[in-house]
């Protein structure tokens, strides 16, 4: 795929995966586990404990460049995320922190604003401008997801559909790298994956990958 970085989205991976990233020189953005939900005080305590475990287990992996200290796609919670950010910086002051958002101009307590940019519809700009997304222009903006569910594509779809899928990924990358405002861009996502009945294409599969579930490449 000619990628130079991977986001673990949004759960820590096996040590063997990180070992291979170290060997290959593949840069890693790894994250606190979770998706959208923030629980009560006991839940937050457990999340902080898991964050500590993740850092202590993995901070000696040279491939890791960014710690995700927010629950993926969650709302702002300044008290909780001040706490997680402080934990990460205390245990590893050498690396930057971030947290993946679907929100524009949410409270930025970390070092890098990570944003899921699903704005491209095939006929508009490939990505949003930095000034429209982050509240602090002095800090880096990273596209943590793009395309994905906006244009699900099966390996068996017709050629025009598969071609448009590839072009949408290309437009997102072009927009992110052309303006000099983005620190990088992660597409969503590498593989098609199983899901629950209320999500995806009705057959319990999300066809969001640039490869299918069996690791066969699509045009993208």
Language model: regions and residue ranges:
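Substrate-binding/catalytic cleft of secreted carbohydrate-active enzymes
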Residues: 5-219
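Phosphate-binding active sites in nucleotide-utilizing proteins
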Residues: 2
